[in-house]
Amino acid sequence: MLATLGFTVTLAVTRGITTVLHKKGAGPNGGIVIGGVHIHHFVFGMVGLIVLGYLWLLLYGFEDKPPRRLFRYTASGYGVCSALILDEFALWLNLRDVYWERQGRESVEALLIFGGILLWGALIYPFALAVWHHFRGHPLPARPR
């Protein structure tokens, strides 16, 4: 659920910022520019996912029962980083900046597919699993709080 929330909020904020920059005529190098090079926001998503992956390895590698709070934070971070990466899916698929061109639609399609998978996992899967167990006569065990 937290990954879905992080994904949705980040997607809305990112699309909002890029739309404002585009409408104000920021040009091809609008946004974050370091040393004359435009840094696309998917770079921050990739770095974030690398850090999260390493953190998950550390959490699983050294503790039998890692703190649930850390998993909540990392789930949110996963959603945030995924939104940053998939918002520019068309860029790394076409190897050129097509964000505002027709091919930019590929990013929207990737976002919808991934968002649907996250929503399914957060909302529909637990319900479907409970219904399945109910009809098979095997109730689900109580979840620890």
Regions inferred by a protein language model and the residue ranges of each:
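Helix-coil boundary and interhelical linker segments in multi-pass alpha-helical membrane proteins
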Residues: 56-72
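Alpha-helical transmembrane segments and their helix-start/interface "positive-inside/aromatic belt" motifs
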Residues: 1-5, 71-72, 106-110
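Primarily interfacial, aromatic-capped hydrophobic alpha-helices that serve as membrane anchors
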Residues: 114-145
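Interfacial helix-loop-helix junctions of multi-pass membrane proteins
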Residues: 90-104
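Hydrophobic cores of alpha-helical transmembrane segments in multi-pass inner/ER membrane proteins
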Residues: 8, 44-53, 111-123
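Alpha-helical transmembrane segments of multi-pass membrane proteins
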Residues: 7-23, 80-87, 122
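Short aromatic-rich membrane-water interface segments that cap or initiate transmembrane helices
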Residues: 31-42, 102-110
